[in-house]
């Protein structure tokens, strides 16, 4: 009479069958009848790269500084306007420059504030494995926001610094010198933060690539 034999199962059931755990993509070979090793405490949390944390903090502080400096940028001064008559004294007119007068600067402040809020949320979720991919996608969006905001603000700043002779737009930074200097300082800090976000995104992709069990 034919003796019955246990068929090897996926979880190690069956007489003398080798167990194979499919909890990971590579699998874990346990040998005949061997028990699976217990998961170490905290093994569900992804490894934290100190460089990524430092870059994230820099992006957080850089976007905060850029948004605050630009949002607080304001200057009031007086300009002289020549009167119609040659012998009449020039008129002194008070004028004010504010970041809200430029849609490019408004977009710059809003974009930096959004990236700051995202960076704070990403730091809070740094130990969550389920947040790795959403944070990576968010970094991509944040980087695009920062570079576009920097480009818009820098273009408007250069227009105020140099003017445009083709359309007869006069430069205004000779009148609003401190205003332009603070605005360009905020743009430079945001540009550095954007490059830091780019490096952070590349490190995150490299970390996921190394940790993936397909490679």
UniProtKB/Swiss-Prot annotation:
Q: Which domain of life is it from?
A: Eukaryota
Q: Which residues lie on this side of the membrane: Cytoplasmic?
A: 1-51, 125-130, 207-215
- Known partners and oligomeric status: Homodimer and heterodimers.
Residues that span the membrane, as ranges:
52-72, 104-124, 131-151, 186-206
**Where does this protein come from, organism-wise?**
Oryza sativa subsp. japonica (Rice)
- Enumerate the InterPro entries for this protein: CASP/CASPL, CASP_dom, CASPL
UniProt keyword list: Cell membrane, Membrane, Transmembrane, Transmembrane helix
Q: Which residues lie on this side of the membrane: Extracellular?
A: 73-103, 152-185
User: What topology does it adopt in the membrane?
Assistant: Multi-pass membrane protein
Question: Its family?
Answer: Belongs to the Casparian strip membrane proteins (CASP) family.
- Name a Pfam family for this protein: CASP_dom
According to UniProt, the name of this protein is CASP-like protein 1E1
Q: Which GO terms describe its cellular component?
A: plasma membrane
Cellular localization per UniProt: Cell membrane
